[in-house]
């Protein structure tokens, strides 16, 4: 998993609350078990005018030319609600997003995002609204996120602080997913196994 320390990128806005995981990645695209290839289906029902995904919806923010290449998503409260599908952060990350900023997240989505190297940032509703206004006002506006300092810097230079659990912060800074964390205990596991008595018939 790629370590996350600081990130500055183009921000895109989805000005909606209660965006659930079925909207993030609809159920018909969940047959794959690898993490790759989900980005094309991200927000499928909003991004496309047809079921096949051949006709992009020009009104949807992710399809607007000014937001192409965005790596930070701004949304409203309760982002990632609904089912616990891990495919949701897979799709967001595969699309190229590194940070989701919202006033609140569904708990399971929040944990899944961190476990997959995606940083969910909780700011107040007023701070998110300010970010949205600044991003909408200036084409190409970028937002900076510093996980070390736990700050978000708006296009105008305003700085907002956010909280994150120390363990989650440590894992993201060091690029540790569940497998990486387990490997860190390799020596301790090996030492324990040498102390286990052999099987006796």
UniProtKB/Swiss-Prot annotation:
SUPFAM superfamilies: LeuD/IlvD-like (SSF52016)
Disulfide bond found in the keyword field: no
GO cellular component terms, A-Z: 3-isopropylmalate dehydratase complex
Ranges annotated as spanning the membrane: none
A biological process from GO: L-leucine biosynthetic process
GO terms for MF: 3-isopropylmalate dehydratase activity
Pathway: Amino-acid biosynthesis; L-leucine biosynthesis; L-leucine from 3-methyl-2-oxobutanoate: step 2/4
Catalytic activity: (2R,3S)-3-isopropylmalate = (2S)-2-isopropylmalate
Keywords, ordered alphabetically: Amino-acid biosynthesis, Branched-chain amino acid biosynthesis, Leucine biosynthesis, Lyase
InterPro entries assigned: 3-IsopropMal_deHydase_ssu (IPR004431), Aconitase/3IPM_dehydase_swvl (IPR015928), AconitaseA/IPMdHydase_ssu_swvl (IPR000573), IPMI_Swivel (IPR033940), LeuD (IPR050075)
UniProt EC number: 4.2.1.33
Function: Catalyzes the isomerization between 2-isopropylmalate and 3-isopropylmalate, via the formation of 2-isopropylmaleate.
Subunit structure: Heterodimer of LeuC and LeuD.
Family note: Belongs to the LeuD family. LeuD type 1 subfamily.
PANTHER family: 3-ISOPROPYLMALATE DEHYDRATASE SMALL SUBUNIT (PTHR43345:SF5), 3-ISOPROPYLMALATE DEHYDRATASE SMALL SUBUNIT 2-RELATED-RELATED (PTHR43345)
Protein's UniProt name: 3-isopropylmalate dehydratase small subunit
Organism per entry: Shewanella loihica (strain ATCC BAA-1088 / PV-4)
Lineage of origin: Bacteria, Pseudomonadati, Pseudomonadota, Gammaproteobacteria, Alteromonadales
């Amino acid at each position: 998993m790629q370590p996350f320390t600081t990130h500055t990128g183009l921000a895109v806005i989805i000005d909606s609350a209660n965006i659930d995981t079925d909207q993030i990645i609809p159920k018909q695209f969940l047959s794959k078990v690898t993490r790759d290839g989900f980005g094309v289906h991200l927000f499928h029902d909003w991004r496309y005018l047809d079921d096949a995904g051949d006709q992009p919806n020009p009104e949807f923010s992710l399809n607007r030319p000014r937001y192409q290449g965005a790596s930070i998503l701004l949304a409203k409260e309760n982002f990632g609600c609904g089912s616990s599908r891990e495919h949701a952060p897979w799709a967001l990350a595969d699309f190229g997003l590194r940070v989701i900023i919202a006033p609140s997240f569904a708990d399971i989505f929040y944990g899944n995002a961190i476990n997959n190297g995606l940083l969910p940032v909780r700011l107040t509703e007023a701070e998110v609204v300010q970010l949205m206004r600044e991003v909408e006002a200036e084409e190409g506006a970028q937002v900076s996120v510093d996980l070390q300092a736990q700050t978000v810097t708006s296009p105008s230079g305003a700085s907002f602080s956010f909280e994150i659990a120390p363990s989650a912060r440590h894992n993201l800074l060091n690029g540790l997913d569940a497998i990486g964390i387990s490997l860190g205990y390799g020596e301790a596991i090996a030492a324990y196994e040498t102390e286990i008595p052999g099987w006796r018939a």
